[in-house]
């Protein structure tokens, strides 16, 4: 599985890269056919509300795209949320495939 991490208005440091790769890398245990995950991390500055960190993920598997967004005041929390939502979506997709395959075996 290829993980591509990019930053928008944010420098991707080695600790951020390693943390993101660790979190996103866990998806492999739920679904083997993930080809690539593109993660874009960004920050929006606000004088009144503080910084808002965004994590956008686009997962490619078996000709399917799964797109997820997460926002939080903390970058690492946004990455955690992105990983959790991607995990749920991958599980849901995998169940959908299982159900589809079961229906076709009658």
Across the structure, where does each feature detected by a protein language model lie?
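N-terminal, polar/charged subdomain of small-to-medium soluble alpha/beta proteins
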Residues: 1-106
